[in-house]
Amino acid sequence: MKDASWRDHCTMGCSLFFLALICGSIIGYFLYSFFNQKKLEEKKQAFDNKLKEKEKDLQKREQEMMRNAKIEIASLRQKLELDLEQRTNTIVDLESKNNRREELLNNRTESLNKREEHLDSEKQIISHTKKNLEQQIKEQETILNTQKQQLEKIASLTQDQARQIIMKETRDQTTYEMMSYIKQEEEKAKSEASKKAKTLLVLAMQKYSGDITGEKNISVVNIPNEDMKGRIIGRQGRNIKSLEVLTGVDLIIDESPCTVILSSFDPIRREIAKKTLEFLVSDGRIHPSRIEKALETSTIEVDNFIKEMGEEATFITKIGEVHPDLIKILGKLHFRISYSQNVLKHSLEVAFLAGKLASEIGENEILARRAGLFHDIGKALDHEMEGSHVEIGVSIASKYKEKKEVIDAIASHHEDQEPQSIIAALVAIADTLSSARPGARKESVENYIQRLTKLETIANSTKGVAKSYAIQAGREIRVIVEPDKIADNFIFQTARTIKEQIEKEIIYNGVIKVTVLRETRAVEMAKL
């Protein structure tokens, strides 16, 4: 009994224990779920708050980006509208010019048509006159027959004798009348031919209108402040001396505010010096070694520009393939001035005029343009080679195997020889048209440049001279000798030789200063 009661108590205790354990687990689970749910809600609330802040921030950024985009779009639209307006104005101007030219051409065409009608009427008149003459001849023959019979009766002449007398008188009278008529018709024909030739020239000139570039012997370089002038001059003038010696250009630094003037009769030299000085001013470092580097860079840049100008000229004229070296020589004409005309512009003008004249008379237009473009090619190298620009041009064209019509045009455009082709004659006419415009040329400037070129030629022909530059408007010639050929003791003799040669060959007023420079450099490279 006791054992059974004890087992019952134990069973009941275990049941209560497990029941209490289950109840505690359930209560603990609900408590855990309650507190965990509260934490999750707090975290969710915090996350929602952060999400709202992010959304607000994104909205602000989106609004700001929209504002910036609208501003940028408005700016671009304004620029595009302005550009469109400018282009529209340009197109309107071009259309207006084209309309005016078309009106002029139409007027000229009508005039030519009228002249053709006039010529046709003249031909009809001539034909009618010819018929009248034939009728008159027949009448004269009838009269002669009558006279012949009368003469035979009166003078008792034989028929052959009378025939000879009558024929001689008739021949003399008819010949006189015919010669008078032929002379009148020849004068009319010459007059009509002259008018038609002038009309062709006017039409050719109207179809091409080129820009005219005036001559300029100085270039101006702007500098940021007056202190830069002192840096350009350098200590004891070493920088400006180095610039003048290396470039061969005269630097003029006066009281003009924030400007430096470059003076030289050689435009290529002056352009290289200008770019060199602009590079040095922008860089800020000005000393002899830096000047040499800047000069090298500027020389390459100008060489590339010369090539571009030559390529542009051949492209504009559409003359086909040209030798690369000949293109470079052609580009140099951009910097060559002759009688106040830019020679490259002049050559382009001659090319187009010659081409138009050729097309009007049925000749090869492309070949005429090519001959016109190269007719003054010798002027690109006339300061480097001996001979006239015509002789040099013929030599260059022959070297690069140009066609015989082109060589003939170069050789005959100054009437040094008779033109052997129609193309050469057309180029000579076009050259005269381009050169003969009022104010197109100035003799005095050309003579001045020729005198400076002659000074340099005399100096360069002296033994041991490396290069020379005429500066100070031809009042000084600066000569640089080769140090390995001319010793210090002989530079005075070189200066005296050049001076005597100048006195023999050049007529001038005043004094020309001859300065001979000899410089020796020693360079070693230190390796670290």
Swiss-Prot record:
Gene Ontology molecular functions: RNA binding; RNA endonuclease activity
Membrane topology: Single-pass membrane protein
Domain of life where this protein originates: Bacteria
SMART domains reported in the protein's UniProt record: HDc, KH
EC number: 3.1.-.-
Signal sequence interval, chain numbering: none
Record field: transmembrane: 15-35
NCBIfam families: HDIG, RNase_Y
Entries under HAMAP family matching the protein: RNase_Y (MF_00335)
Cross-referenced PANTHER family: RIBONUCLEASE Y
Protein name: Ribonuclease Y
Lineage, broadest ranks: Bacteria, Bacillati, Mycoplasmatota, Mollicutes, Acholeplasmatales
